[in-house]
Amino acid sequence: MGVIDARQLKTRGLDAQALTSLPRLSAQNLSLDPRLHDINLSVNAGQILGIIGPNGAGKSTLLHCLTGLLPHTGRSHLDDTDLTALSPRERARCMGLLPQQTDSVWPLSVHDVVSLGRLPWGDNDTTAIANAMRATGIETLAPARIDRLSGGERARVWLARVLAGQPRILIADEPTASLDLYYQQVVMDCLRTYANAGHIVIMAIHDLALAAHYCDQLLLLHNGVSQASGTPAEVLTESLLSQVFGVPVHVDLTAQPPVVSARFHRPVA
C-alpha cells in the first residue's frame, strides 16, 4: 500500500491538510508482564492500524490494554487527552470494542443488540442506530433474533452495535475470524469506510493479505515485543515474516489483491 500521499487521501475523502488536523492516538511503553513489553504506537484519524503476529504474540492483550480492560503500565493519549485517566464511561464513549467472541446468551432482536451501542451515552439515539444498521446493511434484519442469524450476519450486527456508539476510536479483535470470503470483504469495507470518515480504527488481524490491502500502518508483535512498525511495504517483508512466523514466506504486494503466504514444500516420500 505504501506511504499515503495527498492524492490517495483525496480518494478517501481526506486531504493532506485534513489529516494533520485530525486526532492522533499514541501509546507509550504499554506493558503487561509477561504478555506485553514496552509497546509504542501512533495512528492518525482516517487510518487503519493492523496489529499482526503469530498466535500468542500479544495482539488481543494490546487491544485490551488500549481499551482499559486489562491493567497495565504505560500511557495512551488521544491528542492531549490522557486516555488512561478517563473514567470507564468516558473511555467507552471514546473507544468502541468489537471483540472476537460475539455470541449472545439472550435471544435479543438485531435492533436491540445494535441499540446496546448507545449504553455509554445513556440514550436511544434512533438516528445513530439507523445509520449504523444502514452502514452494515442489516436494516431488513432488525426484527430477527440474533441467535438465528448466520455467522456473517451476526458479525455485521455486532459491528453495527459498535458503530451505533459513534466512537472516535474503533478497536476490533480479529473482525474477519471464521467469516467466508464474501463477509470478510463486507466487514473490512465497513471498517475502511469508518476510518475514511475521520475515525481511528485499530484491529488485530491474522490474514496478512487482508492487512496489506486494507491497513495504512502495521505493528508486528512476537512474544509480546514489537518487531516492526510502519506501512505494509515496510513491515511485510519476506525475511522478517519468515523469521517471526518460523516458515518461508512469499510476499507480493504489487499483486491485486496482495499476496502474503507460506511457501509450502512437497513432503519427502
Regions found by a protein language model. Give the residues of each.
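Conserved ABC ATPase signature
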Residues: R145-L149, E153
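Conserved ABC ATPase "signature" region
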Residues: T126-A142
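Conserved ABC transporter NBD signature motif
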Residues: H72-D82, R91
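Helix-to-loop junction immediately C-terminal to a conserved catalytic motif
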Residues: T67
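The feature captures the beta-strand-to-loop junction immediately N-terminal to the Walker
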Residues: I52-P54
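ABC ATPase nucleotide-binding domains
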Residues: S242-A269
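Catalytic Walker B motif of ABC-type/P-loop ATPase nucleotide-binding domains
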Residues: L170-E174
